[in-house]
Amino acid sequence: MSYDELELDKLGDEKSALFFLISDTDTTYNFLVALAFSQMFNLLCERADNTYGGRLPYHVRVLWDEAANTGQVPGLEKIVAVIRSREISLTLFYQAMSQCKALYKDHSETIMGNMDSIVFLGGREASTLKDISENWLGKATISMQTEGRSRGQSESYSQNMQRLGRELMTTSEIKIGRAHV
């Protein structure tokens, strides 16, 4: 190939789609896809800055399915922190958050922290369930009413109302899934 036929830097110039298809069983060429992603983000940021005053004319949405199977993209923790302002968004798809942690080690928290949303389609991996429950869903305030009645020489009745904090969904509730809720 004597010329650039992918033209990764021009993805934000007009409406277009680009697909990378790789084997999910043979990892031989995964590094090429990781390299292409790295190059694409760098070229698009450079083009946004140098040609369009900091923002691409067309939003570039990267839907990166099976992100754990493409290999590590160098500097992804920095890329995810700066692309949004340039009209580039990134959605990473993992089977479990531990895949991101295994691939990016200490930088996985930075990467996940720069994601503005999460879609969880189910799973049972404990650290993923805990992270979703504690860090993504958070807590809710619930009201709990207790009543008591005692009988003896004279009957007494008590009613108590308390406000308590609890996880919006516990790990057990997340694990059950929507079919049982």
Question: What residues fall within each predicted segment?
Answer:
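Structural recognition of the conserved hydrophobic beta-strand(s) that form the central parallel beta-sheet
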Residues: 89-95
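Acidic, glycine-rich active-site loops and adjacent beta-strand->loop/helix elements
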Residues: 68, 96-98
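P-loop NTPase motor core of the ASCE superfamily
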Residues: 7-8, 15-16, 78-81, 99-178
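P-loop NTPase motor domains
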Residues: 1-88, 103, 173-180
